[in-house]
């Protein structure tokens, strides 16, 4: 039997450690935005929506992203705390699926991240009524210009409607592309005691 064909590419290990290893490889391999991830949310009635966002922090306590709390996603997150994330790194032929629940980051965390952003990005976020109807693009640009005039030093304060969420994972699934679609999948489930159970899945 071909040992290379039967060897498992996804280790029996702490899934957060595997994520850290794969994410490091993605940062070295992906040409654009290796921290881009699909975020799936749903209404209280279960109507789903999905969009790309950027991972801005991760560790033992979860995965962090930031957004406008008054956007469509913000409304859905307020109504339904269950979410799913998906990373797809085409250059590595890998993907990671994460399921879990969200909680807001602390105001201090949100302030620190907002202050770290480029001044133009801060202006754009402060001026945007995200997901609401916009009569024309010039209206948005005029709002950005007005804020730029109000804060010529670029120190735009974080709007109250802009913050971040931390996803606490309950399930993490790793997928590795293999030849002839004989892919490899391993799913980890949180055991409720700080550990994980691991299962190899049919592709």
Curated annotation (Swiss-Prot):
Annotated EC: 1.4.3.5
Pathway the protein takes part in: Cofactor metabolism; pyridoxal 5'-phosphate salvage; pyridoxal 5'-phosphate from pyridoxamine 5'-phosphate: step 1/1; Cofactor metabolism; pyridoxal 5'-phosphate salvage; pyridoxal 5'-phosphate from pyridoxine 5'-phosphate: step 1/1
Residues given in the record as substrate binding sites: 56, 113, 117, 121, 181-183
Cofactor note text: Binds 1 FMN per subunit.
Residues where FMN binds: 51-56, 66-67, 72-73, 95, 130-131, 175, 185
Cysteine disulfide partners in this protein: none
Catalysed reactions, as listed in the record: pyridoxamine 5'-phosphate + O2 + H2O = pyridoxal 5'-phosphate + H2O2 + NH4(+); pyridoxine 5'-phosphate + O2 = pyridoxal 5'-phosphate + H2O2
GO terms classed as biological process: pyridoxine biosynthetic process
Molecular function per GO: FMN binding; pyridoxamine phosphate oxidase activity
Origin superkingdom: Bacteria
Residues spanning the signal sequence: none
Pfam families: PNP_phzG_C, PNPOx_N
Subunit note: Homodimer.
Function: Catalyzes the oxidation of either pyridoxine 5'-phosphate (PNP) or pyridoxamine 5'-phosphate (PMP) into pyridoxal 5'-phosphate (PLP).
HAMAP family referenced in this protein's UniProt entry, alphabetically: PdxH
Membership in a protein family: Belongs to the pyridoxamine 5'-phosphate oxidase family.
Protein's name in the database: Pyridoxine/pyridoxamine 5'-phosphate oxidase
Record lineage: Bacteria, Pseudomonadati, Pseudomonadota, Alphaproteobacteria, Sphingomonadales
């Amino acid at each position: 039997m071909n040992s290379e064909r039967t060897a498992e590419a996804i280790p029996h290990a702490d899934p957060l450690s595997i994520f850290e290893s794969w994410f490091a490889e993605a940062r070295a391999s992906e040409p654009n935005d290796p921290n881009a991830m699909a975020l799936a949310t749903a209404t209280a009635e279960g109507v789903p929506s999905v969009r790309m966002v950027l991972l801005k922090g991760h560790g033992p306590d979860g995965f962090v992203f930031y957004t406008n709390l008054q956007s469509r996603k913000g409304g859905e997150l307020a109504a339904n705390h269950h979410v799913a994330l998906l990373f797809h790194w085409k250059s590595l032929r890998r993907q990671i699926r994460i399921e879990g629940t969200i909680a807001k980051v602390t105001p201090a965390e949100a302030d620190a991240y907002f202050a770290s952003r480029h001044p133009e990005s801060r202006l754009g976020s402060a001026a945007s009524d995200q997901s609401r109807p916009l009569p024309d693009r010039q209206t948005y640009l005029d709002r950005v210009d007005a804020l730029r005039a109000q804060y010529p030093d670029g120190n735009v304060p974080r709007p109250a409607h802009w913050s971040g969420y931390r996803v606490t994972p309950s399930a993490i699934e790793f997928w590795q592309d293999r030849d002839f679609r004989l892919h490899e999948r391993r799913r980890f489930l949180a055991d409720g005691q700080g550990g994980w159970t691991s299962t190899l899945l049919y592709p």
